[in-house]
Amino acid sequence: MKRFLQLVSECLTDVREIMPWDLEERLASNPDLLVIDVREPYEFDAMHIAGSLNVPRGILESACEWEYEETMPELVRARDREVVVVCRSGYRSVLAAHSMQLLGYRNVASLKTGLRGWKDYEQPLVDGQERDVDLDEADDYFTPRLREDQLRPPD
């Protein structure tokens, strides 16, 4: 049986990753760049990169195609655009970028370190109403809080 990080690692052989400072440069130099945020809507509403498109990981593949309830026309038309996929920590985005490549997206990358790294690089985030998010609030939000029942039981 594979574990989550093994699956991510295997996809990395085919997926290009960029660092937060690279995304900052790409956003400044390519106004056509599409940032896809594959986190859940409640995560996106809390904070995201301004102008990014929320396409939750669970509907990504159907959102990339015509004739589905989840179809997102901007995403379907983006197969030849530069696309950067983001998530919280850079793992879900690798899986999503891999799927998008299989679906014919030619210039897709994953944000290594995810929005945590974006925040650590002190780049701006906005909330669901597009208001600036305080970086201290973002720091608190991105601090992992595992419940006891989420921890691996002792052997």
Question: Where do the language-model regions lie?
Answer:
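Rhodanese-like catalytic fold shared by cysteine-dependent sulfurtransferases
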Residues: 1-33, 41-82, 91-155
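Short, surface-exposed ligand- or partner-binding patches at beta-edge/loop junctions that are enriched
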Residues: 86
